[in-house]
C-alpha cells in the first residue's frame, strides 16, 4: 500500500509549496531540505495525527519540531503545546531554540518533566486547564525514555507514566490533536518497546502478537504495508556502533578501538568477592558490583548485606578519604607527563616517585590508568563516559585526573547547577584543541540532548545494556558539522571501549555485556529496517507510480488498518547448499560470528537471515586458525 501513502505525501507537498524554508525570530535559520520536507508533510496532512522523528543525533530534530510548532496556526487558530521532556533538556535545547526562532509560541507552551515523581498529576492537571476549543500538539522528546517508563513491570505493577501513555493513544486521533515523538534510538532494551511505540502512534494497529520467530520477523511485508508514513527516517550512519565509519563533508570519521586491559591482582581479588556478594544478595543479574570492581577497587571490599546503611556509607567514605589522602601533594613530574604525552610508558630512567605513584594507581584501576594515558596522548579534546558517579566512579576518576594534570569538567547529577555553563565553555572556539579544558567526564546524565564539538577521542569505561545507549553516547561527539572548526587532519573521533580482562581467561562482566548487546541487535536491526521502509522519505523516493489525490479523506482509513501477523504465509523454509563460514564486520575483528555461504554466493547469519552477497574479492583474515571474512 506504499503507493497510496505516496499519493498523500504528494498531496501534502502540493498544499505547502509556499511554506517558507527559513525560520525567523530574534535570529534566522534556513532549514535543511529534509527538515523542510517532513514539516511540510506533517502540516500538509491535517489528519496525520502522529509522527515519529527517527533522526540520528545531531541532524536537528529539535529545530524541525520548533519549525512545525511555529506553523501550527497555518492549519488551525488555537493550539496548546505540551512538551514532555527530561528536566535537563528543558532550558537547552528546547527553550533556547524556541526563544531564538519562534518566541511567539512560548505563551502556548507547557513543559512537563516526565522524570518528575508527580508527572502524572501535573500532566492531567494541565490537560484540564486547556480551553476546549483548542487543539493540542504533544511533543515527546527522547520518546524511548517515555515508552520505557510506561512499560508494565515484571511484577505486574502499572507505572504512573502508563496512564499518560493510555490517554495519548486514545485521545490524539479521536480529538483531532497532533503528536510528534522524537528519538535517535526508538528501541533500546526490548522488542516490546517497538509494539508500545507503534500503538502510541497508530492506536490498536499492533495487537499482542509475536513479532519474531527464531529471531526473524514473522512478516516484515505486512508491517511495512500497514505502517506506511509512520515516521521520518534520517539516519546517515546505519552501521553498528562497533563499526568504523568514513568521514564526510558534514560528519567526522569514526574509528572504533577495543582496549583490553588486564586487571591487577588486587582488582581480580576484589572482583571475585564482588561476584560472590552479588550471588548472595540476588543481584547478580544486574552485575553492578562486578562492573564497579572492574573500574576501581579500594584496598578492601565493603560488604553491604545485613548492615546498617549509615555504617556502610561511613566505611565507603573512610576508604575514599584514605585513598584521597594517600595522593595528597603527589603528582607526576613534568618528565613523566611528557613521556605519557608521547604515548610511552615510564622507562628505567624514571624517578622512583613516578614509578611508585604509577604502580599504586594501576593496582587499584587499570581502566583509569589507561584512560589517563589515552587522554594525555590525544591530539585534541576528549570525552569520558563513566556511569557511576560516587564510590568507584567519577569521584575517584577526578582524583586520577588531578595527579595526571588533566584539566576537566564534569557533567553528572552532582553538577546540575553548573554543567550547562561548563559544557558551553568546553565547546568554545578558543578551546577547540583543548588548550583550556582537555576533557569532559560524563555520566548517563550526559547521554542525551547535549552536543560536544571538536572531540577527537571518546573513552567508554563501562558497557551499557544496549547498543542504543552507546549510540547516544557516541552521538554526543559525532554530529552534523561538529568538527567544522577542527583542522582537516583532525576531523575524526576515536571511540575507545575499555574492556577489563581476568588473568585466567574467563569472561568478565564487560565481555558479558558486549555479548548481550550483540544478541539484542539482531532483532533491532530488522525493526529499524521496518522504520526505514515505512518512512516518509523512503516512500517519497521509491514510490512514483500513483494517482494524485485532491483531498485527505481516506488517510485515516489507510493508517487505521490492523496488522495481522497470525499467518506464516510469508515464511518459507528452504534447504540451501553451501558451507559454514566465520565473518566479522570489523577489520580489527572485534566480534567474530558464525555464518553460512550458499553456493549462489549469498551470505546468511547463524539464524538464517540473509546478510548480503559475497564480494568478488572478499577480504579474509586469519585468526586463531580460522578464516574470517570481513564484510
Swiss-Prot record:
Helicase C-terminal domain ranges (all copies): 367-532
Keyword NAD: no
Reported effect, residue 62 to S: No loss of ATP hydrolysis
Chief location category: virion
Spans annotated as Binding to the cap-specific mRNA (nucleoside-2'-O-)-methyltransferase: 457-524
Residues reported in the UniProt entry to bind ATP: 55-62
Effect of residue 185 to A: 50% loss of ATP hydrolysis
Record localization: Virion
Catalytic activity: a ribonucleoside 5'-triphosphate + H2O = a ribonucleoside 5'-diphosphate + phosphate + H(+)
Origin: domain of life: Viruses
Annotated function: DNA-dependent ATPase that acts as a 5' to 3' translocase on single-stranded DNA and thereby plays a role in transcription termination of viral early genes. Uses forward translocation in concert with the viral RNA polymerase RAP94/OPG109 subunit and the capping enzyme/VTF to catalyze release of UUUUUNU-containing nascent RNA from the elongation complex. In addition, acts as a positive elongation factor to assist transcription through problematic sequences.
Protein name, entry field: Nucleoside triphosphatase I
Natural source organism: Vaccinia virus (strain Western Reserve) (VACV)
Species classification: Viruses, Varidnaviria, Bamfordvirae, Nucleocytoviricota, Pokkesviricetes
UniProt gene name: OPG123
Amino acid at each position: 500500500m506504499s503507493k497510496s501513502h505516496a499519493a498523500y505525501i504528494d498531496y501534502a507537498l502540493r498544499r505547502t509549496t509556499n511554506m517558507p524554508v527559513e525560520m525567523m525570530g530574534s535570529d534566522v535559520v534556513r532549514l535543511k531540505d529534509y527538515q523542510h520536507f517532513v514539516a511540510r508533510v506533517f502540516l500538509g496532512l491535517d489528519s496525520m495525527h502522529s509522527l515519529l522523528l527517527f533522526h540520528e543525533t545531531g541532524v536537528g530534530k529539535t529545530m524541525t519540531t520548533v519549525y512545525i510548532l511555529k506553523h501550527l496556526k497555518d492549519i488551525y487558530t488555537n493550539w496548546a503545546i505540551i512538551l514532555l521532556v527530561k528536566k535537563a533538556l528543558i532550558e537547552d535545547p528546547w527553550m533556547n531554540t524556541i526563544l531564538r526562532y519562534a518566541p511567539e509560541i512560548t505563551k502556548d507552551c507547557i513543559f512537563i518533566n516526565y522524570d518528575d515523581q508527580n508527572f502524572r498529576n501535573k500532566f492531567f492537571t494541565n490537560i484540564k486547564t486547556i480551553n476546549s476549543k483548542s487543539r493540542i500538539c504533544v511533543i515527546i522528546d527522547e520518546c524511548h525514555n517515555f515508552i520505557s517508563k510506561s512499560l508494565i513491570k515484571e511484577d505486574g505493577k502499572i507505572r504512573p507514566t502508563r496512564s499518560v501513555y493510555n490517554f495519548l493513544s486514545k485521545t490524539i486521533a479521536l480529538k483531532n490533536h497532533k503528536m510528534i515523538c522524537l528519538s535517535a534510538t526508538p528501541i533500546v532494551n526490548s522488542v516490546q518497546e517497538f509494539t508500545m511505540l507503534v500503538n502510541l502512534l497508530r492506536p490498536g494497529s499492533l495487537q499482542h502478537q509475536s513479532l519474531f520467530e527464531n529471531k526473524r520477523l514473522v512478516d516484515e511485508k505486512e508491517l511495512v504495508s500497514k505502517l506506511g508514513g509512520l515516521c521520518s527516517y534520517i539516519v546517515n550512519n546505519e552501521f553498528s556502533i562497533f563499526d568504523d565509519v568514513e568521514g564526510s563533508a558534514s560528519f567526522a570519521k569514526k574509528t572504533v578501538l577495543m582496549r583490553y586491559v588486564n586487571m591487577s591482582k588486587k582488582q581480580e581479588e576484589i572482583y571475585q568477592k564482588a561476584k560472590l556478594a552479588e550471588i548472595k544478595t540476588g543481584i547478580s543479574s544486574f552485575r553492578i558490583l562486578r562492573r564497579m570492581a572492574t573500574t576501581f577497587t579500594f584496598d578492601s571490599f565493603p560488604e553491604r548485606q545485613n548492615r546498617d546503611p549509615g555504617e556502610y556509607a561511613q566505611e565507603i567514605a573512610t576508604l575514599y578519604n584514605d585513598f584521597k589522602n594517600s595522593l595528597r601533594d603527589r603528582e607526576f613530574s613534568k618528565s613523566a607527563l611528557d613521556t605519557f604525552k608521547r604515548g610511552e610508558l615510564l622507562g628505567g630512567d624514571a624517578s622512583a616517585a613516578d614509578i611508585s605513584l604509577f604502580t599504586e594507581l594501576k593496582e587499584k584501576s587499570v581502566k583509569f590508568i589507561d584512560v589517563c594515558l589515552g587522554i594525555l596522548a590525544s591530539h585534541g579534546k576528549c570525552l569520558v563516559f563513566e556511569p557511576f558517579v560516587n564510590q568507584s566512579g567519577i569521584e575517584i576518576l577526578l582524583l586520577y585526573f588531578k595527579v595526571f594534570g588533566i584539566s576537566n569538567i564534569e557533567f553528572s547529577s552532582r553538577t546540575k547547577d553548573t554543567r550547562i555553563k561548563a559544557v558551553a565553555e568546553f565547546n568554545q572556539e578558543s578551546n577547540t584543541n583543548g588548550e583550556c579544558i582537555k576533557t569532559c567526564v560524563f555520566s548517563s546524565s550526559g547521554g542525551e540532548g547535549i552536543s560536544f564539538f571538536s572531540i577527537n577521542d571518546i573513552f567508554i569505561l563501562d558497557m551499557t545494556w544496549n547498543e542504543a545507549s552507546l549510540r547516544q553516547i557516541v552521538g554526543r561527539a559525532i554530529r552534523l558539522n561538529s568538527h567544522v572548526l577542527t583542522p582537516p587532519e583532525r576531523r575524526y573521533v576515536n571511540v575507545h571501549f575499555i574492556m577489563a580482562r581476568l588473568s585466567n581467561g574467563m569472561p568478565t562482566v564487560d565481555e558479558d555485556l558486549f555479548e548481550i548487546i550483540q544478541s539484542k541487535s539482531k532483532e533491532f536491526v530488522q525493526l529499524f529496517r521496518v522504520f526505514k521502509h515505512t518512512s516518509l522519505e523512503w516512500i517519497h523516493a521509491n514510490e512514483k507510480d500513483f494517482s494524485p489525490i485532491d483531498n485527505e479523506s481516506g488517510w485515516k482509513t489507510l493508517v487505521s488498518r490492523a496488522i495481522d501477523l497470525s499467518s506464516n504465509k510469508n515464511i518459507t523454509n528452504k534447504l540451501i547448499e553451501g558451507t559454514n563460514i566465520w565473518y566479522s564486520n570489523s577489520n580489527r575483528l572485534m566480534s567474530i560470528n558464525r555464518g553460512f555461504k550458499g553456493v549462489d554466493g549469498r551470505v546468511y547469519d547463524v539464524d538464517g537471515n540473509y546478510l548480503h552477497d559475497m564480494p568478488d574479492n572478499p577480504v579474509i583474515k586469519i585468526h586463531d586458525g580460522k578464516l574470517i571474512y570481513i564484510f
